[in-house]
Amino acid sequence: MSFSELNIDAFRFINDLGKEYSMLNPVVYFLAEYMMYFLALGLVVYWLTRTTKNRLMVIYAVIAFVVAEILGKIMGSLHSNYQPFATLPNVNKLIEHEIDNSFPSDHTILFFSIGFLIFLFHKKTGWLWLVLAFAVGISRIWSGVHYPLDVAAGALLGVLSALFVFWTAPKLSFIHQMLSLYEKVEQRIVPSKNKSNDKSKNF
């Protein structure tokens, strides 16, 4: 059995769950289409805690996503495939999507780059974001818009980019300088009695 056949078989196994357990399709649809807004809201909440640790985490997370997305575009130019619903018969398709290159999965890149970066900062609670990232990845296959390989590649890019940024960004002093300047201006405009720059504080 070829790797391509394994990829298709794995897709069929997950996607066919939508036919067997159709009552879960609305939940899967929500995960696949709208959970990104929950992720964005989570980053806003972390930012509004006004701790330097959380704000650096948000900045690093955004950088990790940008790095992963750039790498994803490069990978997509080297290998491409259309969505399963465009190439396979009898696909459980939950999402209306234009036919284009589905490799790698942008949604998975987004959730794993940011989710894993959060995990690196907050290991006690960050695993929840990884569970969410995994759920979103599965939902994209279940919905018929990605193959397992698309999702796996996106997850790998996201994790590697998060690790790269987590290890290298602290050495970029201008990030800390810009954040410090922002916080000084913010403190003048919107004073916070409990403002703390304690990087060990968890949210």
Curated annotation (Swiss-Prot):
TM regions (residue ranges): 27-47, 56-76, 103-121, 126-143, 149-169
GO biological process, one term: response to antibiotic
UniProtKB keywords: Antibiotic resistance, Cell membrane, Membrane, Transmembrane, Transmembrane helix, Transport
Places the protein is found: Cell membrane
Keyword Transmembrane: yes
Pfam family, one: PAP2
Chief location bin: membrane
This protein's record includes keyword Cell membrane: yes
Molecular function terms from GO: undecaprenyl-diphosphatase activity
GO cellular component: plasma membrane
Topology within the bilayer: Multi-pass membrane protein
S-S bridge residues: none
Superkingdom of source: Bacteria
Similarity comment: family membership: Belongs to the BcrC/YbjG family.
Role summary: Part of the binding-protein-dependent transport system for bacitracin that confer resistance to this antibiotic; probably responsible for the translocation of the substrate across the membrane.
Name the record gives this protein: Bacitracin transport permease protein BcrC
Organism of provenance: Bacillus licheniformis
